[in-house]
């Protein structure tokens, strides 16, 4: 595994986080569950906005997978972060599938907060394949830069980073998304 930093500790990748067989198995699992439409979260709740997001999604709660991936990711995660320490991954996994013409327009990722006060601060995104054209993850500050998907690479970025999943020109893109969870430390 090798780290590539794009913007300090706010946006970075860990290459070869998963191997090709692991990625293929995740794609198989997601396809076997079946993809559906992917709404966006607004102040009015979950809404369909195909002008913003037109890819498909599968959600799967899997605490065992969260623990397994967390053990592998721990050396690469930013901790402490401000007045919090990283404690694990969100067990709600989201598999995204993007087909030609699909994208996720510029947006900020929202935080997930547990009842015990743990809160996500960073997006945890694994590229499950790279045999497609287009589909890079584009960031807009500072300046515009993009991350080209590589099979098995983990992309970690701070939720308030404005970004988009660029349109797919050909092929199908698969990603696995979760969040890095943090707990506030005592002052």
Label for each model-derived stretch:
Residues 1-154, 160-187:
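Fe(II)/2-oxoglutarate oxygenase catalytic core
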């Amino acid at each position: 595994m090798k780290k590539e930093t794009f913007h300090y500790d706010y946006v970075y990748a860990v290459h070869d986080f998963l191997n090709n067989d692991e990625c293929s198995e995740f794609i198989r699992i997601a396809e076997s569950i079946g993809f559906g439409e992917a709404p966006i979260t607004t102040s009015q709740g979950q809404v369909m906005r195909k002008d913003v997001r037109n890819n498909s999604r599968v959600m799967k709660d899997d605490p065992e997978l969260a623990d397994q991936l967390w053990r592998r990711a721990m050396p690469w995660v930013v901790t402490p972060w401000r007045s919090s320490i990283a404690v694990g991954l969100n067990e709600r996994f989201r598999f995204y599938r993007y087909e030609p013409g699909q994208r996720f327009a510029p947006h900020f990722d929202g935080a997930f907060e547990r009842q015990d006060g743990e809160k996500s601060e960073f997006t945890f995104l694994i590229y499950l394949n790279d045999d497609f054209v287009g589909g890079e993850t584009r960031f807009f500050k500072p300046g515009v830069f993009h991350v080209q998907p590589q099979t098995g690479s983990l992309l970690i970025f701070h939720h308030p980073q404005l970004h988009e999943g660029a349109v797919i020109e050909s092929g199908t893109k698969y990603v696995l998304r979760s969040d890095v969870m943090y707990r506030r430390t005592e002052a």
